[in-house]
Amino acid sequence: MKYYDILNSACNDVGIGFDENKYNAFIKYKSMIQEWNKKINLTAITEDEDIIKKHFIDCIKIYKFDKFKKLNKIMDVGTGAGFPGIPIKILEEEKEVILLDSLNKRIKFLDEVSKELKLENIKNLHGRAEDYAQKEEFREQFDGVVSRAVANISVLSEFCLPYIRVGGYFIAMKGPNVSEEIDEGKKAIELLGGKLQEIIQVEVEESDLKHNLVIIEKIKNTPNKYPRKAGMVTKKPLK
């Protein structure tokens, strides 16, 4: 139970329940990340304490956005090793969560995690965000989309906003310096049907890590031509 207190403290800070079952799930998940990371590139962060703080607690802090608990159907775009989707699912098993990643090896890992942790109502999808967003079963079907992927806010908005129903939210998990990026991405956000609501500063317990949650509300439907075809989104970001 070495890391119980720090994880419990992080959950208390954001008003989310924590118990021994959730703790055990996080520890099993950590061990699986470390084991699979020997075979495939999941993360450069591999030490026990670093995974707990820089990955798990950082993901827990998404609940700093107080409306997040009320978002029942969630998609995690560019999930990688399952961040923040798996921690969200551990903390709120009743949420419907879809994890999307373009690398099939990562999806196989996430399938194993879902099986080992006995997670239900979760789906791990292999493919590109711009392809799934044009499918009727996914387009504008989600209460919230989250992303911790490394891309600027204009690119992330084009990947993510098409999935969100009007009245839902896009939560982008960004580093400490976002103001310039936000200024450059405002037109793209508006064009895609979004409106910047707030930027929430996040601090991680027992560390000097500081991040930001960029909260974008979906206020109108995304035009059908977005997202553009594979490659265009990143090569020519909307401005």
Swiss-Prot record:
Task: Give the encoding gene's name.
Answer: rsmG
Q: What does this protein do?
A: Specifically methylates the N7 position of a guanine in 16S rRNA.
Tell me the InterPro entries matching this sequence.
rRNA_ssu_MeTfrase_G (IPR003682), SAM-dependent_MTases_sf (IPR029063)
Entry binding sites for S-adenosyl-L-methionine? 78, 83, 129-130, 148
Q: Please tell me whether the keyword Transferase is annotated for this protein.
A: yes
Name the Pfam families on file. Answer: GidB
Arranged from A to Z, the UniProt key words for this protein are: Cytoplasm, Methyltransferase, rRNA processing, S-adenosyl-L-methionine, Transferase
Concerning CDD domains, the annotation shows:
AdoMet_MTases
Family assignment from sequence similarity? Belongs to the methyltransferase superfamily. RNA methyltransferase RsmG family.
Q: What is its main location?
A: cytoplasm
Q: Say yes or no: keyword S-adenosyl-L-methionine present.
A: yes
Q: Protein name, please?
A: Ribosomal RNA small subunit methyltransferase G
Signal peptide coordinates: none
The EC number(s) this enzyme carries: 2.1.1.-
Q: Where in the cell is it found?
A: Cytoplasm
User: One GO molecular-function annotation for this sequence?
Assistant: rRNA (guanine-N7-)-methyltransferase activity
Gene Ontology terms, cellular component aspect? cytosol
Question: What organism is listed for this UniProt entry?
Answer: Clostridium tetani (strain Massachusetts / E88)
Which PANTHER family does the record match to this protein? S-ADENOSYL-L-METHIONINE-DEPENDENT METHYLTRANSFERASES SUPERFAMILY PROTEIN
